[in-house]
Structure formats: C-alpha cells, structure tokens
C-alpha cells in the first residue's frame, strides 16, 4: 500500500493504464483491520478522487467503476466509522464527476462490452449505475449510521441529477431501490439490520 501510495503521490501524471490495479490494491486495503493500512490507502484514494479526477478524469475513466467499488469497501469497514462517512462523501463527489462529463462516458468506449451498449446509455452503465448500486450495497451491508448516510446520499444524488435520467435508466434504478427494501423484509440474520 505504501509503495502504491508513493507512486500515486509522485508519478500520478505518468500513470495511464494502471489505475484499475491501483484501486484493486486500495480495495483490498479498505477491508483491513490495521488502522495505518486503511488510513494510508484511504488518504491516497481521497487524493485521487478530489485532486486527480479534476485534472485528468478523461485518462482515468476506465477505472471509474473500480474507484467507486473501492470507496464502497471503505464505507463498509465497520472498524473505522469516520472513514466510512468520508468515503460516502467521496462517492457523492464522484456523482459530480459523472454529471460533469456525460459525453466523455459516451465517447470513450474502452470496455469490451461497450459495443453492445447504446452510446446514450454508456454514461448510465459506466457512471451512474455503478455509483448508485455501490451506495445500495453500503445500505445493505453496513451499520445503521453508515446505512442511513448512504441512503441519504443515494436519494440526494437521485434528486439532484435524476432529471437527466432516461426512462429506461429509471427502471434499472427502481430495481436497485426495491432490492434495498426487499432485503429489509428478509428474516434477521445480522444484528445491524435489526436496528432499522
């Protein structure tokens, strides 16, 4: 984690295709129980999201889903509640990145399945859906305070940006939302869900 953090801090402008691997390392570190590991990985991930996305988002777009998944894992680490809340805040800032560059997602067909996805739906498939789905996963997996924050941010994103969603995107979104509430109907297996 320290080596990857050092590489990001010193050579971020030279990293082109390695962002997926960087987020994979930080995703693994996000679930660790050692505070120093989680903190270093999260600080570097936060720097990528807040500083580097502003400067070089187009060259990092292929790793966007990995970044969101990584933030979701930080949010679900129950041992570090402050990091969890900050990770959810960063997911919300990722929504701003998606909203600011919808054409970038449409134009950049770098993934193998993008040929089957209509150009106008690529921002949904590669941007909005992974972001909203990751928040729903946090709602389903985490402690009450983190779940509540994730649900609040999920609905804030929908209220803020939902007017730009196409009708077929809403169908996908409702499936995600209904899944959250369907999970709450299941018999209790985890004490955290009993808090609802």
Question: What does each of the following model-derived ranges do?
Answer:
Residues 23-25, 42-47, 64-68, 109-112, ...:
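Short alpha-helical linear motifs
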Residues 95-102, 149-165:
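A short, hydrophobic/aromatic-rich structural module that often spans a beta strand
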Residues 45-49, 100, 104, 140, ...:
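Extended alpha-helical scaffold regions
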Residues 1, 75-119, 174:
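Eukaryotic alpha-helical scaffold "rod" segments
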Residues 20, 65, 129-130:
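Amphipathic alpha-helical repeat elements characteristic of tetratricopeptide repeat
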Residues 2-6, 24, 43-50, 69, ...:
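Residue-level signature of alpha-solenoid helical repeat scaffolds
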Residues 1, 9-17, 25-40, 55-59, ...:
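Short coil/turn segments at helix-helix junctions and helix-capping linkers
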């Amino acid at each position: 984690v320290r080596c990857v953090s050092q590489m990001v801090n010193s050579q971020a402008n030279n990293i082109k295709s390695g962002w997926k691997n960087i987020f994979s390392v930080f995703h693994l570190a996000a679930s660790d129980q050692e505070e120093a590991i989680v903190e270093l990985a999260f600080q570097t991930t936060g720097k990528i999201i807040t500083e580097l996305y502003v400067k070089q988002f187009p060259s990092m777009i292929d790793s966007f889903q990995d970044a969101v998944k990584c933030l979701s894992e930080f949010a679900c680490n129950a041992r570090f509640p402050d990091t969890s809340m900050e990770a959810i805040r960063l997911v919300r800032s990722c929504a701003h990145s998606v909203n600011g560059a919808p054409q970038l997602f449409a134009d950049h067909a770098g993934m193998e399945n993008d040929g089957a996805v209509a150009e106008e739906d690529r921002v949904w498939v590669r941007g909005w859906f992974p972001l909203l789905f990751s928040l729903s996963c946090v709602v389903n997996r985490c402690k009450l305070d983190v779940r509540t924050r994730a649900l609040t941010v999920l609905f804030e994103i929908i209220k803020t940006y939902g007017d730009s969603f196409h009708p077929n995107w809403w169908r996908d979104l409702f499936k995600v939302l209904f899944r959250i509430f369907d999970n709450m109907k299941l018999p209790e297996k985890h004490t955290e869900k009993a808090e609802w």
